[in-house]
């Protein structure tokens, strides 16, 4: 059965999430094309037609990144398949960001990933999307306008894109990791400040369904060490997790939780193994009330379990 609230959520909606520790924000699209915000501040709230931050092409991807919750950026596509940005700054509230004015044209089936560069107080953004020629393009904000960055080469048309940024404690600048599909492989490209973009593609999974959702997070950055978790929807209609752990590389791959076919996925994390963490939160659609967004939780105390079965407005 459904609920009136769940019926407002687009089936296979794009999903994005940001956080400052356990203060959570989740973004999704409603059936009218509006992008809504649900929030967790001790309990779940919002997600109604009063919590719309902007409008996008129906079926648009939704990506988000934040500096804590003081600065939030949400990315979607316009009807004309150009990138657009909804921005929140504490003290200002929501407004239309500058990216839309750049009129960056992307493929109509492009997905989006977004990161604030880690380890700096400056608001530096990197957006990843697929151009009409099916290459993955980086778009950069360094405070002086939006510009095209590095082109990361060809990818499967309509590939999911996951990205994360972190800062090794012994490196002078942020690192970036991005994941997408070439043919059916899931691959990683890497950027480190002393090397730039490494030319090689690292395969993390040999065969995944075409256009599967991809989401990624990182935590526990240390001296040339990082922990990363990458998620995608496999052909068994469950979310799979691929782990990168310091000293082990990519090692642990396995199923997490069932989803609807074609579900999108968002992941957030906080804390680290060194400090009795991390905490992981995964957002997806698994058929609860047909189209509600659901939550999966991992923490050290309880391990893997389902969290909130249906986020507001469901």
From Swiss-Prot:
Keyword presence, Aminoacyl-tRNA synthetase: no
Domain of life: Eukaryota
Assigned keywords, A-Z: Lectin, Metal-binding, Repeat, Zinc
Any Pfam family the entry gives: Fungal_lectin
Region (6 X approximate tandem repeats): 2-314
Sequence repeat start and end residues: 2-53, 54-103, 104-155, 156-206, 207-259, 260-314
InterPro entries associated with the record: Fungal_lectin
Residues where alpha-L-fucose 1 binds: 25, 37, 94
Keyword Repeat: yes
Residues reported in the UniProt entry to bind alpha-L-fucose 6: 44, 281, 295
Residues that, per the record, bind Zn(2+): 243, 245, 251
Residues annotated as binding alpha-L-fucose 4: 177, 188
Binding site for alpha-L-fucose 5: 229, 241
Binding site for alpha-L-fucose 3: 126, 138, 150, 197
Homology family: Belongs to the fungal fucose-specific lectin family.
Function: Multispecific lectin that is able to recognize L-fucose in all possible linkages. These could be found not only in decomposed plant matter in soil, which is the natural environment for A.fumigatus, but also in various epitopes on human tissues. Mediates binding of A.fumigatus conidia to airway mucin in a fucose dependent manner.
Domain remarks: AFL adopts the six-bladed beta-propeller fold and contains six binding sites per monomer, each located between two adjacent blades. The six binding sites that are non-equivalent, and owing to minor differences in amino-acid composition they exhibit a marked difference in specific ligand recognition.
Assembly information from the UniProt record: Homodimer.
Stated name of the protein: Fucose-specific lectin
Organism encoding this protein: Aspergillus fumigatus (Neosartorya fumigata)
Gene that encodes the chain: fleA
